[in-house]
Amino acid sequence: MPKRILQGVVVSDKNEKTVVVRVERRFAHPLLQKTVRRSKKYKAHDESNQYKIGDVVSIEECAPISKDKCWTVVSAQA
């Protein structure tokens, strides 16, 4: 099974070697047929502490690194 890759915005970089990334998804509400936005926050591994708040990054699923962390930052978008 291929690893999932998600795109989001870094909302916290206070932890050592970890960033918190907010990933937003959009979908049509089943009853109202209105576009709804929902977001979820993921902890991702950042080995070199190079990503800062506001950066748009891609994260990739990986083996669990800690209790809450099973994603790693792959790259940043320009």
UniProtKB/Swiss-Prot annotation:
The molecular function GO annotations come to:
rRNA binding; structural constituent of ribosome
Q: Which UniProt keywords apply?
A: Ribonucleoprotein, Ribosomal protein, RNA-binding, rRNA-binding
Q: Which Gene3D superfamilies match?
A: Nucleic acid-binding proteins (2.40.50.140)
Similarity section: Belongs to the universal ribosomal protein uS17 family.
- Which first-to-last residue range defines the signal peptide? none
Under HAMAP family, the record lists: Ribosomal_uS17_B (MF_01345_B)
Q: What domain of life is recorded for the organism?
A: Bacteria
Protein name per its UniProtKB record: Small ribosomal subunit protein uS17
Q: Which organism is it from?
A: Allorhizobium ampelinum (strain ATCC BAA-846 / DSM 112012 / S4) (Agrobacterium vitis (strain S4))
Q: What does this protein do?
A: One of the primary rRNA binding proteins, it binds specifically to the 5'-end of 16S ribosomal RNA.
Pfam families for this protein: Ribosomal_S17
Q: Which GO terms describe its cellular component?
A: cytosolic small ribosomal subunit
The record's section on CDD domains has: Ribosomal_uS17
Which Gene Ontology BP annotations are present?
translation
Q: Which InterPro entries match?
A: NA-bd_OB-fold, Ribosomal_uS17, Ribosomal_uS17_bact/chlr
Quaternary structure note: Part of the 30S ribosomal subunit.
